[in-house]
Amino acid sequence: MGKIVKAVKKIINLTPGIKEASVSVYHKYSQLRYRKYVKKYPIDAHTVVFESYMGRKYSCSPRAMFEAMCEDSRYRDYKKVWAFTDPEKHRYLEKYPNTILVKYRSEDYYRYYARAGMWITNYLLDYGIEKRPGQIYVQTWHGTPLKKIGCDVPRLELSKKERERTCREYQREGQMIDFMPSPSPFYTEKVKSAFCLGPQARILEFGYPRNDDLFRYTEEKCENIKKELGIPADKKVILYAPTWRQSQHTAGEGFTYSLGIDFDKMKTRLGDKAVILFRTHYFISNSFDFSKYGGFIKDVSSYDEINDLYLISDLLITDYSSVFFDYANLERPILFYMYDYEAYREEMKDFYFGIELLPGPVIKEERDISEDVERLLEGFAVDDTYRRFNEIFNPHREVCGDRMVREIIREYR
């Protein structure tokens, strides 16, 4: 059955006009599923729906705010509903009182969205869902952007039809959002324009709940994470987290990723002293076989909470992913391996700022980087560029999820 569904999706994506028509039909179908529950149920102010990365993970700011609510007596009697593509994987969350798990885009999913007094998500809502008067929408997004997003994307990057669709999706979102957390004035400015935020939206600019774990971890927690992942205590940990490429897309399958890093050379130089954690973007559909490297490379792409990976890593290697904004809170070394920089700039057209602001060395050609990695592991110090970066992008470096939920109560309850 899975192969048949995959084949049908591929045909749809490869046939001009059919993809757009199928998306339109799906949107209408989703709206019908949602609206029947709107007609049937009143809003329950004491129900909150949480969703992270379209149901893929228990992570990011929705997780931080959920855990803050669980610790806040004012939310004790609230029903807390999590939407997951695989609810069985997350049954452990039912240990929290009044916590319910539903399958992403199931009937229960639309029913709880229609009834809930509050939604907390980090991605665009399912197109069938429309906010009712009296509901509260907290859109946390999923990181500070380097690449332009939403209505800020340059006209040259997308076709007219694609740009209109993108702007429509973000504008629709922006007219429903009531609250957005913000880690910086830079972030506030960009989400206002990218989402064309309406007058009802309030930006809470005192930190990013998704980073809470980075300010309250213990050595014991780090040791436990390493044990869980099978990482020897005496090895340095390198987190490699590249982003997706628009040009690496297979119709009917999704985005793929072609490795631009020479792991063979890295193992030769670093194999006896380090472990690499490989983390792809959640858009990436292809898998990787690192078995020939033994325990030197561990694929942690399916690991829910990236903060755990930040905490145990001695160095981050990335490219254009927003992970470096979060990781910089730890003031640890970052290497920007932008081996396809010129092609990527041509493809994406524009970033929100120049690479001269980045808090680490930038490599703009494909080559062996093991020596650069070794140098950073052995002799790193926070410099003026790194400090300036955090002043601009991470001025509020403290736990804020609990304050966020208090502000929402104060404003609306």
Language model: regions and residue ranges:
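N-terminal pre-catalytic "stem/leader" segment of glycosyltransferase-like enzymes
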Residues: 2-107
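A nucleotide-sugar donor-handling region in carbohydrate enzymes
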Residues: 16-31, 150-250, 382-386
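Conserved catalytic-core segment of nucleotide-activated headgroup transferases in glycan assembly
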Residues: 59-67, 209-291, 363-365, 400
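Extended catalytic core of nucleotide-activated donor transferases of GT-like folds
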Residues: 63-67, 98-162, 168
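Donor nucleotide-activated moiety binding/catalytic core segment of transferases
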Residues: 101-117, 277, 282-325
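A donor-sugar binding/catalytic signature common to diverse glycosyltransferases
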Residues: 118-148, 303-348
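A short beta-strand/loop micro-motif in the catalytic core of glycosyltransferases
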Residues: 119-120, 178-184, 276-277, 316-317
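Catalytic binding pocket for nucleotide-activated donors in carbohydrate/polymer assembly enzymes
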Residues: 291-295, 322-393
